[in-house]
Amino acid sequence: MDYRQLHRWDLPPEEAIKVQNELRKKIKLTPYEGEPEYVAGVDLSFPGKEEGLAVIVVLEYPSFKILEVVSERGEITFPYIPGLLAFREGPLFLKAWEKLRTKPDVVVFDGQGLAHPRKLGIASHMGLFIEIPTIGVAKSRLYGTFKMPEDKRCSWSYLYDGEEIIGCVIRTKEGSAPIFVSPGHLMDVESSKRLIKAFTLPGRRIPEPTRLAHIYTQRLKKGLF
């Protein structure tokens, strides 16, 4: 798949923050109408101290049949800095994206979207590169305030930055911690909530796109795929 190259990656942290502040102005929070046919999940892991592994899994929806899996392993040069995840993981994701043959209608990232100090988590940032609707799904809160949803499957609450709604907190599995969902690009809060609920099977905490992508990253790390 093609993508737009919007900036250099070899930037010091202070310049990376400036890039984020400029790119956030380009984000479009729009409703996603209808149902997707193909959904992608993205997961990144770090087999070594300076080595990263990116996996993209494309699924048919609503069957969640796996249609394609691509991966990219390479050197990581940007340091781990909260809020600058895209500069650490983005280049590997884009190299994996180049290998993809099946164009997804929606891409789900293991990370943040709008729920970010500068409103530009990895789902938003990469959404601008690929110009496809994206959603960020995180296992923990990076930014924002919320009221804990009740311990009932599919209960939820909004995630706020002041009075602005920037995402939602969804209890996808009873007895488990909630997940933090926020729109990336070409997506809005209500659509991301609706889709992630639909992408998460009963008894699972994590939606199928990123859950399956994570399984493949673990298999690749162990040399089983």
Swiss-Prot record:
Catalytic activity, EC: 3.1.21.7
Main subcellular location: cytoplasm
Domain of life: Bacteria
Top enzyme category: hydrolase
Catalytic activity: Endonucleolytic cleavage at apurinic or apyrimidinic sites to products with a 5'-phosphate
Outcome recorded upon mutating D110A: Complete loss of enzyme activity
GO biological process: DNA repair
Name of the protein: Endonuclease V
Gene that encodes the chain: nfi
